Amino acid sequence: MKKWIMITATYLLILTLLTGCGKPQTEVPADTSGSVAATELTTPPSTENHPTETEEDVEYEGDASSYYIDVVYARQIERYHTAISQQWDEFSYMDHEMSPLAAHYYEGKPLDNIGFTFMDLDGDGIWELIIGAIQNAENDPLVFEIWALKNDEPVMVAQSGSRNRYYLQYAQEDDLWSVAYVAENGAANHAEYYLQLQDGEFNVTQGVIFDAFANEKAPWFMTYDMDWDVSNDTPIDEATADAVLKAGRDIYAAQEYFPYSLYK
């Protein structure tokens, strides 16, 4: 643990000097507090809805970042370190109920290509765990998994797969974090949803569906649910759909993840 803390301190200093910590790589105001890298957590975790204290928890002497890494999300973080270190194939990831897309990030030094961070996506004072891509994140800031605490236990709320991908979004004007969910049922049926986390679950704020099976000549629909049933959605033209999708993709936000190469 001492070795990890020393490495973390060095890494934090480098990030502070070169990039500034905890902000998306898009332009973000300096007072943005929605994202905090694993190296930056210096305040104690909130006591509201905190994991049930055990004797081991009470005696824990690490700082907040260590607590979330070593206790709260220990298993979720560790399993990706194991998989990346051993360079599992897609099937092994799926067998362990993990994102198979991580298997596409082994170029060069695999442990440098994937990392994790903590964010308070729903503003309740409890950090969610985000595991995502570092490699090529400026072009495709893919999120592999998002974990939240629900009833004091870690619960997976998002996982990218071969036909569905998640991305973090940051709306600078509103100082608001959200999540984009891109899903495909094939070339004739696909959608992009914009989500807000609340009480450990995602709520749809808006979505755009392309469904040529429902209407080949006018396949675009605005939706506010994820049931894929466009009969209760609003038909829109292609120009409107393109505008909504462009606005959503323009605020995709790459994170300054703590790389797994520095995890151990």
Question: Language-model segments: what does each one mean?
Answer:
Residues 55-110, 155-165:
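Blade-edge motifs of beta-propeller repeat domains
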Residues 17-20:
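C-terminal motif of bacterial Sec signal peptides marking the signal peptidase cleavage site
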Residues 138-142, 186-189:
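Short, solvent-exposed loop/turn segments at conserved positions within beta-propeller repeat blades
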Residues 140-159, 195-198:
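Beta-propeller blade repeat segments, especially FG-GAP/WD-type strand-to-loop junctions
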Residues 123-133, 173-180:
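Acidic/hydrophobic-patterned starts of short beta strands in beta-sheet-rich repeat architectures
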Residues 22-27, 31-34, 41, 50-84, ...:
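Acidic, small-residue rich beta-repeat scaffolds with periodic aromatic anchors
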Residues 1-10:
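Positively charged n-region of N-terminal signal peptides that target proteins for export
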Residues 112-121, 165-178:
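Beta-propeller blade termini
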